[in-house]
Amino acid sequence: MLLAMALLIIGLLLVAYGADRLVFAASILCRTFGIPPLIIGMTVVSIGTSLPEIIVSLAASLHGQLDLAVGAALGSNITNILLILGLAALVRPFTVHSDVLRRELPLMLFVSVVAGSVLHDGQLSRSDGIFLLLLAVLWLLFIVKIARLAERQGNDSLTREQLAELPREGGLPVAFLWQGISLVIMPMATRMVIDNATVLANYFAMSELALGLTVIAVGTSLPELATAIAGVRKGEHDIAVGNIIGANIFNLAIVLGLPALITPGDINPLAFGRDYSVMLLVSVVFALLCWRHPRQIGRGAGILLTVGFIVWLAMLYWLSPLFVG
């Protein structure tokens, strides 16, 4: 059991590292082929933040573990807001300045409501998967459009922060090297995650949904945690919040869409009745924190969000059938 736990942690870290290097390589390739840096920052990097969840969800679907993938999508969104935003605010209170973010928040809430309409009947169909993936494509087209608009205006704080984070060195050989390394690491790492998560689920008699909501969700959210804390410490507040918004949209559109397309079927009724409801509630709270005046997310809010995450875990354990068998 301890070996499985250690291998699961190593696998999650390798998935996160492989995703980071793949985004680095993709950014260099896009820059080499003349794609504007701001579009790279708002598309490639946005997808990269959710890449660990996407990869693990894809692997889970190929193994027929639909509830694990659904749990990872919903749990990652809850973790991103309650734990990651909460810890970032505890490290240093921050303010949301970007007009781009305030335009994206309603879309995050819209996608959250759409996800509820997909989950409410207790099953994911291929048509649901196609619909969600089309939503992801529309979202990408939208952020390309607002990236071009922000590039022309040139005075938005988020755009300045994203440009500062893009790699400025490295050519095609470096990009292809990291791309190759990532494509070797990530399949092995995801196999480690899925196999050892299954071992732990069997050992503790945990449901696949509960495992996805907790262990997998927290583990695959490590890149968002690192980005958020590094961002607020460097004063790049908007990129910390922007990554959470982008990750939450891609989690619902792609991390739910791929399993529906690959392994359609019934899902645990608790996914909608319990976990989706919590995710929608914390998404609304997140939006209100970003919209209110002044738009500062202080340590008080950080404490409330972090405590909310602990309460949610306690609710999973005490009030719901977290374990099966």
What are these regions (language model features)?
Residues M1-G325:
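Hydrophobic alpha-helical segments, chiefly the membrane-spanning helices
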